[in-house]
Amino acid sequence: MKNIAIIGASGYTGAQISSLINAESTMSIQGLYVSENSLDKGKALSDLYPAYSHIDLCLTPLTDDAKQTIVATADAVVLATDHGVSLHLAAWFYQQGLAVFDLSGAYRFSDVAQYPKWYGFTHEYSQVLADAVYGLAEWNAPQIATSKMIAVPGCYPTASLIALKPVAHLLTDILPVINAVSGVTGAGRKAQLHTSFCEVSLTPYGVLGHRHQPEIATQLGQEVIFTPHLGNFKRGILATITVQLAAGTTASDIEKAYQCYDSAELITVKQNQFPKVDDVVQTANCHLGWKFDEQSGYLVIASAIDNLMKGAASQALQCIKIHFNASVNH
């Protein structure tokens, strides 16, 4: 039985992974934690999320004593916290010998020079960063199994990379174009005007400047044009990706490339059929659909995931299971 501490449990992602871990027969929740100044400290998780009434745990403030208790009693820590918070907590728990699964972006880039530009801080833990593994579960399982510092990918990069990595060897110098729409939960639980019921609409944001663009490019090995959009629905991501493939590429070549997912039970690939968000909401699955025009050489791929599940919590759980050698296919 692996004992897992969850820090940042009051947010959408933290609550989601709390529910997932609570349902695992080989795992237990060591504790649910929030910051010392959180207005939610002391509340039951079910007070914030009645759907989780079966989880009889309260949100504990993360004091120094609480951190020492985690080190003494937990096998792993999940960080569902802001990048600037995870930066320090991840390094501290890692240095204490715990496995760390960080859902923020604080350890996704191996290059320290990326952090001031994209996250607004200077990374001061170069050795921990050097040990960090990018937790794209279907692609980096051997590294996830052996590292104790796992940077769980962002939601948009997960949807995009699962779609693009199988055909990366077929790409030309023309940049892939990724247009992706996310549900409002992707913006977090904190009240904001642009995510309020009367204001939310379908709109692009972070145009030519979203931090997930370099994350996708780094892991793909090629620059991309990425435009995220906020949709007027709660959860889910649909990414539509257009790429030009090398001259002479055939539909059979693409079909063969996607056979890398034949044994990946959480990924479904279909030719000339396209997914919708409702197909994957509340699941750990990724649905891909693709169509290829041999005359122009253009391939269009659609990738659908639940942003809180495969785009965050359930992928973190996959990484935990890979690390502790448990079954991941449910």
UniProtKB/Swiss-Prot annotation:
Catalytic residues of the enzyme: 155
GO biological process: L-arginine biosynthetic process
GO CC annotations on file: cytoplasm
One of the record's GO molecular function terms: NAD binding
Catalysed reactions, semicolon-separated: N-acetyl-L-glutamate 5-semialdehyde + phosphate + NADP(+) = N-acetyl-L-glutamyl 5-phosphate + NADPH + H(+)
The UniProt record lists the keyword Amino-acid biosynthesis: yes
InterPro entries tied to this protein: AGPR_AS, AGPR_type-1, NAD(P)-bd_dom_sf, NAGSA_dehydrogenase, Semialdehyde_DH_NAD-bd
Compartments where found: Cytoplasm
The keyword Repressor is annotated on this UniProt entry: no
A Pfam family reported for this protein in Swiss-Prot or TrEMBL: Semialdhyde_dh
SUPFAM superfamilies: Glyceraldehyde-3-phosphate dehydrogenase-like, C-terminal domain, NAD(P)-binding Rossmann-fold domains
Major place of residence: cytoplasm
Pathway(s) it belongs to: Amino-acid biosynthesis; L-arginine biosynthesis; N(2)-acetyl-L-ornithine from L-glutamate: step 3/4
Protein keywords: Amino-acid biosynthesis, Arginine biosynthesis, Cytoplasm, NADP, Oxidoreductase
Domain of life: Bacteria
Entry's EC annotation: 1.2.1.38
Enzyme class at the top of the EC tree: oxidoreductase
Family: Belongs to the NAGSA dehydrogenase family. Type 1 subfamily.
Entry function: Catalyzes the NADPH-dependent reduction of N-acetyl-5-glutamyl phosphate to yield N-acetyl-L-glutamate 5-semialdehyde.
NCBIfam families according to UniProt: argC
HAMAP family: ArgC_type1 (MF_00150)
Record protein name field: N-acetyl-gamma-glutamyl-phosphate reductase
Species per Swiss-Prot/TrEMBL record: Shewanella halifaxensis (strain HAW-EB4)
